[in-house]
Amino acid sequence: MNNPRPIRRALISVSDKTGIVEFAQALTERGVDILSTGGTARLLAEKNIPVTEVSDYTGFPEMMDGRVKTLHPKVHGGVLGRRGQDDGIMEQHGINPIDIVVVNLYPFAETVAKEGCTLADAVENIDIGGPTMVRSAAKNHKDVTIVVNAHDYDRVIAEMDTNDKSLTQATRFDLAIAAFEHTASYDGMIANYFGTMVPSYGENKEGDNESKFPRTFNQQFEKKQDMRYGENSHQAAAFYVEANPEEASVSTARQIQGKALSYNNIADTDAALECVKEFNEPACVIVKHANPCGVALGKDVLEAYHRAYQTDPTSAFGGIIAFNRELDAATATAITERQFVEVIIAPSVSAEAIEIIAAKKNLRLLECGEWSTKTTEFDIKRVNGGLLVQDRDQGMVSEDELEVVSKRQPTAEELKDALFCWKVAKYVKSNAIVYSKGDMTIGVGAGQMSRVYSAKIAGIKAADEGLVVEGCAMASDAFFPFRDGIDAAAEAGIKCVIQPGGSMRDDEVIAAADEHGMAMIFTGMRHFRH
């Protein structure tokens, strides 16, 4: 049922005042009376918009430094009153019906994110009256409209103009859902913040008592896309994103052209983009089934692409390609003339490249923007009945942190190759082995239960493409528990090995490297990826 409700009286109280003056002016022009509080009321008055202070309406002043403003029966009775049922009692107590509530909440997340934020600062930014009004209006959505997002202001005015200054029940219900989502997210942020203080109980936000993991884990994501299916065709799926993601990512990327991204497209594109971010030089990463099958650097992205493709042209078919520089016309031409590709993602795409890619209508082209700093988000893995939550693996050793444990020191070229393939190995499914030489992958062995077999696969892949393993560096995402992996690497022609170290048999493994005249480098950091 349409069940329209006319808008005659509004209550406006916002912390984020984006667009509020224009919205209030539009409401006034449509005959709506406005109640408001504090800073919002002052702003509207300064703009010559007729407004009644809530304290004047209730006859009760704001008090306790603004802690108590709207918590009054004349406010909540006007919001919660059921039209046609509570009219008599509202009239008896001088309560005017409020038809639309426009509220957004104190900036708690922004406050606690600031350096030096104290518990007292956080507490004063916990909104009480705001969520109460939001929930009251959302509960009474049958009669009252609640607006918590500035991007809905134009929508409200447009519907009023086409619906005799009224809003439909469908619109009110939709806005009520957004309101409950808003307060749920807000309360979750507060719970997370306080939960990280256990067992210090807020006495000090520093030191050993602080935990980055709260007692309960509250996170909210917004649905960005319904999908045809999930990882497999019998699985239903949707894509959810954080409310305000800051980092350039597949979640924030703009799709320039192509079919809708599939579940697997998104997972693989994320893997490719996060890998290519590790490199400062022009780089290309080609991913298949969430594993890099070719990674290379070059003087430009065209050269990087040619070299990355050379590693494994077979696996590159139907893959995902990521760049850390603008996709130009020459590279777009090379890709479209050479191979079938599902997705290309880059920080930016030239107009000429867009025109070239347009000939491949199904090819998904994404532009993610530049990235600068890495975020401190969590990695979340669902298990049956629970969640595994950890820091994102953003660790990467520098040259100064490496420990050469072999008798032979690596040459400058070997050291450079070792650092390159170590970065790649971080993004290969465990057990991961990567061969590289001259800033390109020569062979990749991924996802084997045996580290030795991963090494063998890397060698087989290199041989299949006619690439020379002799003189390569080899990276292993975790330590070698036995010397057999080193013996196999030496037989293949590997001259330098980079690995975390830390095995009970490190001495045996190092001795094997020395026997073969290999250089061996310990990173002291493991990069398992499951």
Swiss-Prot record:
Pathway: Purine metabolism; IMP biosynthesis via de novo pathway; 5-formamido-1-(5-phospho-D-ribosyl)imidazole-4-carboxamide from 5-amino-1-(5-phospho-D-ribosyl)imidazole-4-carboxamide (10-formyl THF route): step 1/1; Purine metabolism; IMP biosynthesis via de novo pathway; IMP from 5-formamido-1-(5-phospho-D-ribosyl)imidazole-4-carboxamide: step 1/1. This is Bifunctional purine biosynthesis protein PurH. Keywords: Hydrolase, Multifunctional enzyme, Purine biosynthesis, Transferase. The keyword Transferase applies. Belongs to the PurH family. The lineage of its organism: Bacteria, Pseudomonadati, Pseudomonadota, Gammaproteobacteria, Vibrionales. It comes from Aliivibrio salmonicida (strain LFI1238) (Vibrio salmonicida (strain LFI1238)). HAMAP family: PurH. One of its GO terms (molecular function) is IMP cyclohydrolase activity. InterPro entries: AICAR_Tfase_dup_dom_sf, Cytidine_deaminase-like, MGS-like_dom, MGS-like_dom_sf, PurH-like. The IMP cyclohydrolase activity resides in the N-terminal region. Residues 1-148 form the MGS-like domain. NCBIfam families: PRK00881.1 (NF002049), purH (TIGR00355). PANTHER family: BIFUNCTIONAL PURINE BIOSYNTHESIS PROTEIN ATIC, BIFUNCTIONAL PURINE BIOSYNTHESIS PROTEIN PURH.
